[in-house]
A protein has these predicted regions:
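C-terminal soluble interaction/assembly domains
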Residues: 160-168, 172
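Thiolate-centered catalytic microenvironments shared by cysteine-dependent enzyme domains
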Residues: 1-89, 106-107, 122, 169-173
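Positively charged, proline/Ser/Thr-rich regional signature most characteristic
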Residues: 1-7, 85-161
Length: 173
């Protein structure tokens, strides 16, 4: 962080490909370590390029900064195995954001990727399927609040205030 000129007050902007999967994962990691001054470019790199915005291969250089990392706090944004088991036993909602074929067990990993890294296919009992890509439009931008409500409240019957665990294969979606 320091060698990249990032201080505790720096706004960090993330962007990426594949509907910002990895950008949102990096955003999540920053939240995990208490750096909440972070944003994700809606539409990612693909939309940036489609709009004719400038790109470069030049790596920027910033003056070193001081950064004091906060103590990692998983509690508010991460569920571990035992948390999930308690959640399932209590009948609370889970959302599987992997592809439909991963949810059904037909694939162990996303389509067009090596089928490795998971011990078995399928999903956690009781989980509803809402693939990550459904939260995004075809141009990679995120759907608006009404569109997301139609999916999560209308299609899978989540209610405001529900204690929900969302999961994928390794946490990048």
């Amino acid at each position: 962080m320091e060698r990249n000129g990032i201080s505790n007050d720096t706004t960090v902007i993330f962007y990426g490909d594949k509907n910002n999967w990895w950008a949102t994962y990096a955003f999540w990691v920053f939240q995990l370590f208490g750096h909440t001054n972070a944003k994700v470019i809606d539409g990612g790199r693909a939309k940036w390029i489609a709009e004719g915005r400038a790109t470069t291969r030049e790596v920027p250089k910033y003056a070193a900064s001081n950064y004091k990392a906060k103590e990692r706090n998983d509690e508010p944004i991460r569920a571990f195995r035992d948390d999930v088991l308690v959640h399932v036993k209590a009948g609370k909602p889970l959302v599987d954001v992997r592809s439909t074929k991963e949810y059904t067990g037909e694939l162990l990993h996303m389509p067009d990727y090596p089928q490795e890294g998971a011990l078995r296919g399928g999903h956690i009992p009781g989980a509803k399927s809402v693939p990550w890509a459904r939260a995004a439009n075809s141009d990679g931008t995120f759907k608006n609040a009404d569109e997301l409500k139609a999916i999560y409240e209308g299609e899978i019957s989540l209610k405001k205030g529900d204690d929900v665990i969302a999961y994928c294969r390794i946490g990048e979606r």
